[in-house]
């Protein structure tokens, strides 16, 4: 069963797109050396016990990637007909017609975003918000409260552990 996983990692965003036990892809916000160290931990404690082949690291140097399972372009991912947006910068807020708001399945909010959900929701309407482990505590509390008020499920990786979702 294909899965989306967002792991709790110190000072990093880590998104794992699992197609099968043999095929998966991982995006991390850290340098390749740090990513390799973190993947060693995941391999020993997660992939090996579950008989999963270690994932292919998505290249950060490229802003685009596409194969038959996964496509991404500048923070926007499509995997098994599900959309995910990685919000690690501030959006340029434009006054939009409500019909122009982008509907997505998952919004992963990470370090680099200094906006509130109430501002982001003017352009993006997620079905699920996931707060990455590197997202600052002060903003985390605001997002949790605003998501609750908007009736949007919000998963905090720091307090609730890894986000795992069958697709």
Give residue spans per PLM region.
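Extracytosolic and intramembrane catalytic regions of membrane-associated proteins
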Residues: 16-167
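Hydrophobic alpha-helical transmembrane segments in integral membrane proteins
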Residues: 1-14
């Amino acid at each position: 069963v294909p899965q989306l996983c967002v792991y709790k990692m110190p000072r990093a965003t880590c998104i794992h797109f699992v197609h099968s036990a043999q095929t998966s892809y991982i995006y991390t916000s850290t340098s390749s050396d740090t990513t390799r160290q973190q993947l060693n931990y995941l391999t020993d404690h997660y992939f090996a016990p579950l008989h999963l082949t270690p994932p292919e690291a998505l290249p950060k140097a490229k802003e685009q990637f596409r194969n038959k399972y996964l496509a991404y372009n500048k923070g926007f991912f499509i995997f098994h007909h599900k959309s995910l947006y990685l919000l690690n910068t501030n959006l340029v807020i434009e006054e939009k017609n409500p019909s122009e708001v982008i509907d997505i399945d998952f919004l992963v909010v990470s370090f680099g975003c200094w906006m509130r959900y109430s501002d982001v929701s003017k352009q993006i309407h997620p079905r699920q918000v996931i707060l990455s482990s590197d997202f600052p505590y002060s903003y985390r509390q605001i997002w949790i409260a605003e998501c609750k008020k908007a009736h949007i499920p919000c998963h905090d990786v720091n307090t609730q552990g890894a986000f795992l979702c069958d697709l």
